[in-house]
Swiss-Prot record:
Its main location: membrane. This is Heme A synthase. It is found in: Cell membrane. One of its GO terms (molecular function) is oxidoreductase activity, acting on NAD(P)H, heme protein as acceptor. Belongs to the COX15/CtaA family. Type 2 subfamily. It catalyses: Fe(II)-heme o + 2 A + H2O = Fe(II)-heme a + 2 AH2. Pathway: Porphyrin-containing compound metabolism; heme A biosynthesis; heme A from heme O: step 1/1. Its EC number is 1.17.99.9. Its cofactor is heme b. One of its GO terms (cellular component) is plasma membrane. The chain crosses the membrane at residues 25-45, 111-131, 139-159, 174-194, 210-230, 276-296, 305-325, 327-347. The gene is ctaA. HAMAP family: HemeA_synth_type2 (MF_01665). Keywords: Cell membrane, Heme biosynthesis, Iron, Membrane, Metal-binding, Oxidoreductase, Transmembrane, Transmembrane helix. It comes from Rhizobium leguminosarum bv. trifolii (strain WSM2304).
């Protein structure tokens, strides 16, 4: 029988302890990034709900950090806004002081986005150079950084859609912008969850991992639909529940031609699909919870299933309240915040079925 080498065991234990310290630091960093992303999405939602997204008509990644500081600079910024259709057709009586109200939302949104780039890139460089990032995670983290850079271009691409002909931004580009933000959020959540300790509880069923993936992906699809609702102001189409102006299925869902375009450009149809999506997500998480509680009660997987169903139920209630109150700003933002919480937890739940990233040992490193 082989006798363990105390020196080798000590080296392995030392390596694991060091890796655990590094993982705690990475989790703290990614958690802070997730919090910043959450704030960014909320400010972006407020920018949309207050119709502030077109208040800054130029893309100046570096110079744009500094807002107007004098009356003359404010007049110049306002003059640029006066050139676009939104001002000419909708806001032609707006004053400079009123313009400042919408300007600050868009400026804050862009400033936070730039700040997130810094708080992601600089720690990433530091952790990389000091050898604290495991090899398996280096390029995925670089990929998230690249998505962040791409998101900046997508944001301007979205804004530019409302500067020449339209009086608002394209709902397609708005949805793309929000989905990309969610993908960046999901990437950070996935890695942070993989760096966290996991229980050894068995999965409730063979299909649990696939079902968790389905829920997470469908939650993202529901967010995409929500972005279309916001982009088309579809939240004002039907402000009754559970019926839609007295009908389960309204008669004016397919009034545009070709018929399929209604799913993207008819506000009433988009709201209807978003409602159906909410019912579907509710059903998926209910089934998931029932399976988990029956097959593996008292496990961490069952507890996650209960929490996920509870979050979706709460989000549905917030959505209904927002609808009935005709989308007041604070309720609209609460609904958007709830969507990101549901999606983030769905990603963490999905990642939970894969277990913690394996620890590298001193022997493996030498090999």
């Amino acid at each position: 029988m082989a006798v363990a080498n105390p020196t080798t065991e000590q080296a392995i234990l030392s390596e694991v302890r060091k890796q655990n310290r590094d993982r705690r630091a990475l989790r703290f960093w990614l958690g802070f990034v997730l919090l910043a992303l959450f704030c960014l999405v909320l400010v972006g939602g407020a920018t949309r709900l207050t119709n502030s997204g077109l208040s800054i008509t130029e893309w100046r990644p570096i110079h744009g950090v500094i807002p107007p500081l004098s009356a003359a600079e404010w007049e110049e910024e306002f003059r640029l806004y006066q050139r676009i259709p939104e001002f000419q057709q909708l806001n032609n009586s707006m004053t400079v002081d009123e313009f400042k109200g919408i300007f600050w939302w868009e400026w804050a949104h862009r400033l936070i986005a730039r700040g997130i780039g810094v708080i992601f890139a600089l720690p990433l460089l530091y952790f990389w150079l000091t050898g604290r990032i495991e090899k398996r995670l280096r390029w995925p983290l670089v990929g998230i950084l690249a998505l962040g850079g791409l998101q900046g271009f997508i944001g301007w691409w979205m804004v530019s859609s409302g500067l020449s002909v339209r009086t608002d931004v394209s709902q397609y580009r708005l949805a793309t912008h929000l989905v990309m933000a969610c993908l960046i959020f999901a990437g950070c959540m996935w890695i942070m969850r993989g760096l966290s300790p996991h229980s050894n509880d068995p999965a409730p069923a063979r299909s649990s991992r696939g079902f968790a993936a389905t829920i997470a992906i469908f939650a993202l699809f529901q967010i995409y639909l929500g972005a279309l609702v916001a982009g088309l102001d579809a939240g004002f189409s039907y402000n009754t529940w559970p019926l839609m102006d007295g009908a389960l299925i309204p008669s004016d869902l397919l009034i545009q031609q070709p018929f399929w375009i209604n799913a993207f450009e008819n506000p009433k149809t988009v709201q209807f699909i978003h409602r159906i999506g909410a019912y579907t997500l509710f059903a998926l998480t209910l089934i998931n919870m029932v399976i988990a509680l029956r097959a593996a009660p008292w496990t961490t997987h069952a507890r996650r299933a209960v929490v996920l169903f509870s979050l979706v139920t709460l989000q549905a209630a917030i959505g209904i309240a927002t609808l009935l109150m005709q989308v007041p700003l604070h309720w609209g933002l609460l609904h958007q915040a709830g969507a990101l919480v549901v999606f983030g937890f769905a990603i963490a739940n999905w990642r939970g079925f894969y277990g913690e990233y394996p620890h590298a040992t001193a022997i493996a490193e030498r090999g």
